[in-house]
Amino acid sequence: MTELHYLTVSAAHTALAAGELTAVELTEACLARINATEPQIRAFLHLTPEAALAAARAADERRRRGQALSPLDGIPIGIKDVICTNGVPTTAGSRILAGFRPPYNATVIERLLAAGTVLIGKLNCDEFAMGSSTENSAYQITTNPWDTSRVPGGSSGGSAAAVAAGQVPATLGTDTGGSIRQPAALCGISGLKPTYGRVSRYGLIAYGSSLDQIGPMAWTVADLALIMNVIAGHDPRDGTSAPLPTPDYTAALTGDIRGLRIGIPREYFVEGMEPGVEAATRTAIEVLREQGATLVEVSLPHTKYALPTYYIIAPAEASANLARFDGVRYGFRAEGETMWEQIEQTRGQGFGPEVRRRIMLGTYALSAGYYDAYYRRAQQVRTLIKRDFDQVFNEVDLLATPTSPTVAFPIGQKINDPLAMYLSDVCTLPINLAGVPALVVPCGFSDGLPVGLQLIGRPFDEATLLRVGDAYQRVTDWHTRRPDLARA
């Protein structure tokens, strides 16, 4: 058997069901791995070992009685620290939420607990999910397990690094402009951004309310399908949740992609893309052709406007969402002679520089004199971007593109150059603006660092993406590669 800490979710489920492994043994292996690697990786902000072991013991007892709740029963999982967990610190990577313990669970947490998963802790992220490197956390900088001098991506960098380092078999992340997919690619794991509305956002600390989506991160597409079977589905507590039936995602993994038409959008192979990244991506796309898919070159002409459009809409939504954090009822509170001075000092000291930058940008875009020139126009361009996807999906079943124009970059290289950092998400932002689903699978290496292939689907057609990603993983072994932390 593979080292316990590097088991996939699917392999762990098989071993648990066969009685070859107990949930307690698996949880103890994960906790030991976290203790051994956390000084290098710094993925976790808060651990819950006692609760995790208690949940694992309960899972073992259910399995002994033949009453396992789901294939995830007894599987440890980590949670990005923007998702509310009852009684467990939830900071969104921000000083302003220091010490905050939510009085309720997010819907995705309720569903994971009902399925018997073992919640092992909360994972580091860029503050309020604003960033592409996890350097914006108020608490620590997470490193990439393939090279600890480099970033893991962001904003779900802790979620990606924890899987890649073998700390947990799977995690939840969130994706507002690429925050599941880019770190998955940079850390050599698989990650899915579901369609907007497919997974409940109730209990998610919002960054951009029309863009955010919760999704799974793990080694394999089969693992993602198992998690989606638990977390997907309508939630009446979330007004943005789609009242649609959800398929059995594992049943979609047939291995057969013959006859599918895959579009290759020319705009995604951007100027400045590293040659090794483009080569690995094109090689992966060729594998799909060899498996029976038809490749079609297509165009998404408004892609070039996605970056400025996103950086008007997302900060505008952040400006509104983050207005609620004032230190009056919970979290960090600064001193002040008056209530208004206290609030001003709390927000000035509690928010980090990138969050303050985006709040100011969003407030400016929403101001009376500039609303039409910026925010309204950005929403109009967003409609054109969405229309591009609608039209291209009349011709093809899905799209295949690079995920990031580069491999993981050195820590500190871009943190003082916001535009360079924003360009890291040039291949992922349009998908959030359009609200469609996208999957990332590892597809090779460039200069010894992982590269990810991005597959983009029709709205609510995650099943086809998972089918194609799983078929790709059946004939390649990139998802089986593991970093050597002794050399990282």
UniProtKB/Swiss-Prot annotation:
Belongs to the amidase family. GatA subfamily. PANTHER family: GLUTAMYL-TRNA(GLN) AMIDOTRANSFERASE SUBUNIT A, TRANSAMIDASE. Its EC number is 6.3.5.7. Heterotrimer of A, B and C subunits. The keyword Calcium does not apply. Allows the formation of correctly charged Gln-tRNA(Gln) through the transamidation of misacylated Glu-tRNA(Gln) in organisms which lack glutaminyl-tRNA synthetase. The reaction takes place in the presence of glutamine and ATP through an activated gamma-phospho-Glu-tRNA(Gln). The keyword Nucleotide-binding applies. The active site is at K80, S155, S179. GO terms for molecular function: ATP binding; glutaminyl-tRNA synthase (glutamine-hydrolyzing) activity. GO terms for biological process: translation. This is Glutamyl-tRNA(Gln) amidotransferase subunit A. Transmembrane segments: none annotated. It holds the Pfam family Amidase. It catalyses: L-glutamyl-tRNA(Gln) + L-glutamine + ATP + H2O = L-glutaminyl-tRNA(Gln) + L-glutamate + ADP + phosphate + H(+). Keywords: ATP-binding, Ligase, Nucleotide-binding, Protein biosynthesis. It is an enzyme of class 6 (ligase). InterPro entries: Amidase, Amidase_CS, Amidase_dom, AS_sf, GatA. One of its GO terms (cellular component) is glutamyl-tRNA(Gln) amidotransferase complex.
